């Protein structure tokens, strides 16, 4: 067992369930909550306790990790009826692993501080497969001492941990990373479409690309699945669109103009309107292919 061995997870979707699985298999005591209880109940077989509210998760935990849809959901589980702050006790810390606007994150952290609860923002790069293997990249914002006191927990789920500074820093970096990913998926989709239009094999395109300086994790790992039409989701197109909304909102808050982010947002929205929202985000290839024909 660990000295800080009681962990709570609020939000047991694909990523939350994978993080929970990793922590359970690493010997932590885990209490979980999800608004749709069935998604939390499936973790019982691995030894998790299922709570009836965020308040009950907080009461049972040293560290509560929130992995929910957006800032509004973070607010609700934090400060709403039977929220985390209602379960406050000495030593409780919250780590938000959602993807939200860094400005909102700072505001939420301030509310937590006023309630006497330290909050870290701890968004991650990587999906469920990386979470279960402890290979996430964790980006941390918040009080450094609080982070260092809980670093062993983050080391359990992540192979690389970056402490970035004040609250909101982790979420700002996460948005920059997801903007990069959304663009890579689009550019790879257009390149595959161009190659096919020229009557060439996309497999050869990928082999050439991955033989050069310009290869990426996406071209190596996602590219072969894309050309086979395998869009089983690890992160849905609809979720990427939600993050692009957040990216554009953050840019506005920072008084920045990001024209490619705006264009990407529109393209992903158009793909959703074409019924592709539940595909993996790389399913944007389906939309690019369809709309490329004149």
Residue ranges and their predicted role:
Residues 36, 70, 143:
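Residues in the short beta-alpha loop(s) of Rossmann-like NAD(P)-binding domains
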Residues 19-20, 39, 108, 153, ...:
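Hydrophobic residues within alpha-helices
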Residues 54-59, 63, 71-136:
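Rossmann-like NAD(P)(H) cofactor-binding subdomain of soluble oxidoreductases
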Residues 1-66, 92, 97-98, 128:
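NAD(P)+-binding Rossmann beta1-loop-alpha1 motif at the extreme N-terminus of oxidoreductases
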């Amino acid at each position: 067992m660990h000295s800080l061995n009681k962990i709570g997870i609020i939000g047991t979707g694909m990523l939350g369930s994978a993080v929970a699985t990793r922590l359970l298999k690493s010997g932590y005591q885990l209490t979980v909550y999800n608004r749709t209880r069935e998604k939390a109940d499936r973790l019982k077989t691995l030894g998790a306790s299922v709570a009836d509210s965020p308040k009950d998760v907080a009461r049972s935990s040293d560290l509560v990790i929130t992995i929910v849809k957006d800032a509004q959901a973070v607010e609700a589980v934090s400060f709403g009826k039977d929220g985390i702050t209602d379960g406050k006790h000495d030593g409780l810390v919250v780590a938000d692993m959602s993807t939200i606007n860094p400005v909102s994150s700072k505001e939420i952290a301030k509310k937590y501080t006023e309630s006497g609860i330290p909050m870290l923002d701890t968004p991650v790069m990587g999906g469920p497969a990386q979470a279960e293997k402890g290979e996430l990249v964790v980006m941390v914002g918040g009080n450094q001492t609080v982070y260092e006191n809980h670093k062993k927990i983050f080391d359990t789920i992540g192979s690389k941990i970056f402490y970035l500074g004040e609250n909101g820093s982790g979420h700002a970096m996460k948005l920059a990373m997801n903007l990069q990913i959304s663009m890579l998926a689009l550019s790879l989709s257009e390149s595959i479409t161009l190659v096919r239009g020229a009557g060439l094999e996309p497999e050869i395109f990928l082999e050439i690309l991955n033989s050069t300086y310009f290869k990426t994790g996406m071209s190596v790992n996602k590219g072969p699945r894309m050309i086979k039409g395998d869009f089983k989701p690890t992160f849905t197109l609809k979720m990427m669109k939600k993050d692009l909304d957040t990216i554009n909102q953050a840019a506005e808050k920072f008084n920045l103009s990001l024209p490619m982010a705006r264009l990407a947002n529109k393209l992903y929205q158009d793909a959703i309107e074409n019924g592709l929202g539940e595909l993996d985000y790389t399913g944007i290839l389906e939309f690019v292919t369809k709309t490329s024909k004149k």
